[in-house]
């Protein structure tokens, strides 16, 4: 259902430097072409299919606002444009994934509930050095999806509810002295490693 489409959109938009969706994904279309098939009936592979976008919005059957928000977040954060700057962080729950991307002064931490059916809680343990922070720093983070702000340090509690808050996309506000290029910047194609 819809929560699965939401979490897959967040993962695709934040893990990869490029992303896109087929028409109909925004409406959470998932009718199989035939029983057991991974291919969708209305995939536009074989036909163009008109869709009633307004009715879908009125019925709450669209994730278009989330996709719009994800695109806006990607535009604001150069760290999300990279691939080699991806770092994973520990969580206390296998149903929750946490990772970060940092490019120069821009750092983003993403935490996603991989279970589209149940609320999941976890303790996220960040590798602060990967974010350009000291071992015991506590910094403000802003959830780019909700606008809420928190203070995060090495260990952080999260509760993610499918359909309501399936993920956090956190902009880490690095202290002024921590805005130097990140170690992974030099490994990106076309980026010089010299200051």
Give the role of each language-model region.
Residues 2-8, 16, 21, 25-195:
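Carbohydrate-interacting/catalytic domains
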